[in-house]
Design a protein with these regions (language model features):
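Hydrophobic "anchor" residues on beta-strands that sit immediately upstream
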Residues: 107, 142-143, 177
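Short, charged helix-to-loop "capping" segments that act as catalytic/coupling loops
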Residues: 134-143, 172-173, 231-233
Length: 239
């Protein structure tokens, strides 16, 4: 039972990402695995047409970025189009240029808060522009926000509207996935991971995971929930 995670763990993940519990699942230890499964689901099934049946599939990758994101895309033969970071997100003019010059970009994968290694915190305006431009470009354009450092404000940091709220504002939830984990909160390779997405993308991810696993480790979920009752407990732990 509970293939999406125990209720309390889903509730915590939803609170962390400001998402709805109905659109939140709890995975294994790694959010990277959830991203891989999400890309695999689009490759095999797709929101409209499976990526495996399309040519010149590409993704926009902010640089400098996470090498595992790049390796993941390489596995699927997805072309990577780089866009520089500016200190407060991606270079929007370069982002627009990539959209204009390439016909089959399937999305962007980025770390919107404390991006490693530059430390960029994407401004609300930057995220909003990414969402609006990508949505106008294609109904298949995915916004994958790997929020690996969501609660890692060790010093005063810029405030940021939750990505879920911005995606909802721009009517882009069905194309948006937000992920985070406790890899750098509790135990590396021993924490929890969470994914939240709009209905269409969420159902696609669930479809893929249902074919691969029966359930994630619910005992580990309970272990964490006994330690973290809510988001405030997580934030207090991270001070």
């Amino acid at each position: 039972g509970h293939p999406l995670g125990i209720h309390e763990a889903r509730e915590l993940g939803a609170e962390l990402m400001s998402a709805t519990i109905e659109n939140t699942l709890v995975g294994e230890q790694s959010s990277l695995l959830l991203i891989y499964q999400l890309i695999l689901a689009n490759y095999l099934f797709g929101l409209v047409t499976p990526w495996k049946d399309q040519e010149d599939v590409a993704f926009i990758c902010p640089v400098p970025g996470f090498d595992r994101h790049f390796r993941l895309l390489e596995d699927f033969g997805i072309k990577m189009l780089t866009v520089p970071l500016t200190g407060s997100g991606v270079d929007i003019e370069k982002f627009k240029e990539l959209l204009e010059k390439n016909k089959n970009i399937k999305g962007i994968m980025c770390v919107p808060r404390h991006s490693n290694p530059s430390g960029d915190i994407y401004s609300d305006e930057n995220i909003s522009e990414i969402l609006q431009l990508g949505k106008e470009y294609s109904s298949e354009f995915l916004f994958i926000f790997d929020n690996a450092y969501l609660v890692h404000d060790f010093s005063p940091s810029k405030k940021q509207t939750p990505v879920w709220d911005l995606a909802k504002k721009h009517n882009a939830l069905d194309q948006t996935a937000i992920l985070c984990s406790f890899s750098k909160v509790t135990f590396g390779s021993g924490g929890l991971s969470f994914a939240a997405a709009g209905n269409k993308l969420f159902n696609l991810l669930v479809r893929q995971r249902t074919s691969m696993i029966v359930s994630a480790d619910k005992v580990n979920q309970l272990r964490h929930i006994e330690f973290f009752k809510n988001k405030d407990d997580v934030l207090s732990h991270m001070k």
